[in-house]
Amino acid sequence: MENFDEVIKEYQKYLEGKEKTHKINSCKHPCCEEDNLKSVKNYFKVYHKKYIPSIIQKKKKERNEHAPPLLKDIQDKRCTNVFERLNDKQFYTGVQKTKFMELLKNNKNKSSYCYNNIKVFSTMLKKPCNYVVTPGTLGIQKYGIQTGRPKTIFLFNNEKKYDKGVYFLVKSYIKNIKSLCYEITKILQPSIGPTRKIYDQNFSLVRNVNDLINGGKYLCTSGDPPAPIRNLSLHFLT
């Protein structure tokens, strides 16, 4: 009888185990439904152009239930561009939000806030410069004109009918007629001899460098008197 009782107990255990497996396979408990897995599936969703995901818990703590949710409008906010998000006032809170609102009121450029609000101190401002004398005249007032503008004259060779003249600058180092004739000889290069006498258009002899006229025409000879008028250049006579 003892063996029979043991067999019955083992058979009852077998039936109980079979019923449990059948219940598990055919269980329709709400814990096994897919609706309860939505909160978990939120972690695996891919949001298109959403910068703040909607997986943030909507339930706040009891002490913050009376306050309006700050991210209520942001969760479903879609921004096509980074600059739209940066220029959206809903993303700013606290001190940054007040600064942003001041920008909108003053119609300032949103991208150059730091440049429009630079404090200018008195040490940064340049003081106006008061000139004692007009610029460029101080050296003349102290030392005078060091080098005057050189005179320009036109030189003609004697007995050259078709001579058009040579442009010549009477520089400051030429102090007398001798040095003037020496410089003229290097330019004209006469075939007869070096230049020794200089005549003006009135055929008067030039004896001093200061007698030269700016823009005047002069005839250079090697010590001979001026040639007849028919042998002189028309450019010199006119």
UniProtKB/Swiss-Prot annotation:
Instruction: For this UniProt record, give its keywords in alphabetical order, as a comma-separated list.
Output: Cytoplasm, Cytoskeleton
Residues annotated as domain Doublecortin:
151-232
The record's subcellular locations are: Cytoplasm; Cytoplasm, Cytoskeleton
Which Cys pairs does UniProt list as disulfide-bonded?
none
GO terms for CC?
A: cytoplasm; cytoskeleton
Query: How is this gene product used in biotechnology?
Result: Human microRNA candidate miR-197 and to a lesser extent miR150 causes the down-regulation of apicortin and thus may be a possible candidate for nucleotide-based antimalarial treatment.
UniProt superkingdom: Eukaryota
InterPro entries (alphabetical): Doublecortin_dom (IPR003533), Doublecortin_dom_sf (IPR036572), Mss4-like_sf (IPR011057)
Give the region (Partial p25alpha domain) as residue ranges. Answer: 82-112
Q: Give the primary localization class.
A: cytoplasm
Q: Which SUPFAM superfamilies match?
A: Doublecortin (DC), Mss4-like
Complex formation:
Interacts with alpha-tubulin 1 and beta-tubulin; the interaction stabilizes microtubule assembly.
Supply the domain comment.
Answer: The doublecortin is involved in the binding to microtubules; however, it is not sufficient by itself and requires the partial p25alpha domain.
Q: What else is known?
A: Tamoxifen used to treat breast cancer blocks the interaction between DCX/apicortin and, alpha-tubulin 1 and beta-tubulin resulting in microtubule destabilization.
Q: State what this protein does.
A: Involved in the stabilization of microtubules. Probably by controlling microtubules stabilization, plays a role in invasion, microneme secretion and parasite growth in host erythrocytes.
Protein name per UniProt: Doublecortin domain-containing protein
Native source organism of the sequence: Plasmodium falciparum (isolate 3D7)
